[in-house]
From Swiss-Prot:
Pfam assignment, any one: Homeodomain
Annotated Polar residues bias: 1-14, 163-179, 199-217
Record-linked InterPro entries: CUT_dom, CUT_Homeobox, HD, Homeodomain-like_sf, Lambda_DNA-bd_dom_sf
Annotated source species: Caenorhabditis elegans
A single GO BP: regulation of transcription by RNA polymerase II
Protein's name in the database: Homeobox protein ceh-21
Biased composition (Low complexity): 218-233
Keyword presence, Methyltransferase: no
A GO CC term assigned to this protein in UniProt: nucleus
Top-level taxon: Eukaryota
NADP recorded as keyword: no
Cystines in this chain: none
Amino acid sequence: MSQQFQASSGTGSASLREFKTEHEDLREDLPYSTLRTLFGITLDKDASQALNIALLLYGHNYPQQVVPPERNYAELDAQLESVVLEDHTAESTMEPGVSATVTEQLEEKSDKSSDGDGTSKRLTRSLKSVENETEEDHEEKEDEAPQSSRRESTRLKRKLLESQKTVQTTGNSSRASSKSQEKEVPGTKSQCAPKIRTTPEQSKAATKRQSSTTVRASSTCGSSVSSTSTVSSPDYTAKKGRATETPKLEELAPKKQSSATPKPGGEVCVWDGVQIGDLSAQMNAQIGDDEELDTVDIARRILSELKERCIPQTALAEKILARSQGTLSDLLRMPKPWSVMKNGRATFQRMSNWLGLDPDVRRALCFLPKEDVARITGLDEPTPAKRKKTVKVIRLTFTETQLKSLQKSFQQNHRPTREMRQKLSATLELDFSTVGNFFMNSRRRLRIDQQISRSSRSTGNGADTEDELDEEDVVVENVIADATDASNQPGPSHL
């Protein structure tokens, strides 16, 4: 590469442009040390020439601080300006025929090039460099040039645009052929695509093409992007850029749901390949009055059926028998004889009818929805009894005056007459039943206190006197009389 540079360095800016066109594959961010190594340039002698080539290759944005500090910056700047001016004058004096030949050469190169992406990228970059140079030259001299030069510039621009379009079409065709050969998955893009400077018209056309391709890609691949499957991974195929998935095991498994709504009128319900019709007559059959069922044998058969067929006990209890799981467990664990049983006969009768069905039908009934089983078997679900709303009784509290008056009356007479109680209720503004309850409760508390004191004295003295026994008999008689009187007129209890 150093020999190429030495051969081209003495021929002027035209050879430098050719060198630039041939070596466009160099990166734009190469440091000065890499340039020096590539071109075989020593640090002391040819630093200015390397900087000139860097400016011609990569534009005026190349950092100038990489120049060795022992060089004179003023001399380098003057040399660079002279080289750049020569380059611009050569470009401005280029005739339309020369630019046409350049475009023809580019087209010939694109036709002869292979289908790979590297050739199309180099052609695009070379076309970009020519376009940039012509646009910068015409922008600087647009105000000073005559009308004829402006027309020539517009012609050059049109030719450049046409040549760029042809290069893009060839590049797209080459990319498509390379992708078809490599069998890549659709939707992947090249990460090292070149940055091309385009006009507003070209950018609009590119956005339209991109939107159309994205719509096509979404329409073709939309069906493949479905819910994720935990059973198998998607198996992609390269035919026409479509992705397919292997079927899930859940889709291949039989559907364990009723395909039709079962009704007693004769419609059939299918569950796991088992057809179930109307079973109300078989499930509601009753035995004669003289017959009896062996409850122990029925319980044993039910337990073995649940274990062998893997049927939950809750499903049998709630869907077939309309009972709770706890009730069924008690009946199966301790079955009573048929002659002794009163309330559980209907449950054992239904269990016996269920055991008389086909084994597959028996199991299917336990896995159908509860409403469907009720329709098929004609089961009426028991309705719970409505509880009566109990009114909460507000507890009465005596005032201090009322309590003192009642206690004083009780000390005077433990059993006041009816007229006396009516007078107290009117005086204290209390109900008649409330006054009667107070005297009854007071007598009960007095009796309890007497029993406690008597028991304490008996433990101390060892025996009860006859007077105490007579007094206890009187208290018992009084309590019985008070109870009969209170039963006629009940009321809330008070302390």
